[in-house]
């Protein structure tokens, strides 16, 4: 992953009521996405059955309002990891004996990283410690350094930004200073 400063434990879960409640998502009761017990008066009881990452089942929890996005996620690279398999097959070439080693490396590293909608648009990825970006506010365009390059920084991030010696950055970044999303 990339270099992202870890958040303090309280920063990972604090909901900024002023910011969050002013958003469309802030108008939805917590239990609509996260479950739990709305009538409970104690924290432990209120959090029984809590779903920490509802976007792991995006069709169920996000699809009612975000039908188009959740439908396209089924074929998205962060879900299918198709780009990795293209690379693995290219690197292995016509040498099937290379596949087991590459597949093992993929299973031990890359296959554990990829993520849900919320883990890019609401919080930092788990591999850099997780935690909400800005008090549970959903970011339509996530902050590149706290989301995209947090995972892809040591490999793809530097390549995208043109930080690898002798290799120019991605044309979208070089020419248009476009973020990766």
Language model: regions and residue ranges:
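Short sequence/structural segments immediately N-terminal
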Residues: 1-181
């Amino acid at each position: 992953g990339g270099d992202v400063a870890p958040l303090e434990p309280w920063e990972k879960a604090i909901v900024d009521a002023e910011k969050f409640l002013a958003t469309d998502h802030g108008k939805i009761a917590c239990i609509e996405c996260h479950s739990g017990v709305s009538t409970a008066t104690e924290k432990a009881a209120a959090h029984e059955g809590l779903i920490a990452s509802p976007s792991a089942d995006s069709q169920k929890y996000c699809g009612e309002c975000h039908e188009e996005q959740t439908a396209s996620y089924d074929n998205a690279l962060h879900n299918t990891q198709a780009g990795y398999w293209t690379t693995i097959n290219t690197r292995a070439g016509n040498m099937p004996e290379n596949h087991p080693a590459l597949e093992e490396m993929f299973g031990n590293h890359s296959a554990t990283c990829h993520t849900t909608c919320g883990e890019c648009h609401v919080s930092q990825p788990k591999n850099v410690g997780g935690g909400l970006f800005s008090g549970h506010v959903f970011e339509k365009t996530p902050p590149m350094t706290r989301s995209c390059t947090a995972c892809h920084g040591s490999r793809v991030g530097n390549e995208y930004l043109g930080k690898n010696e002798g290799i120019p950055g991605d044309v979208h970044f070089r020419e248009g200073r476009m973020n990766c999303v």
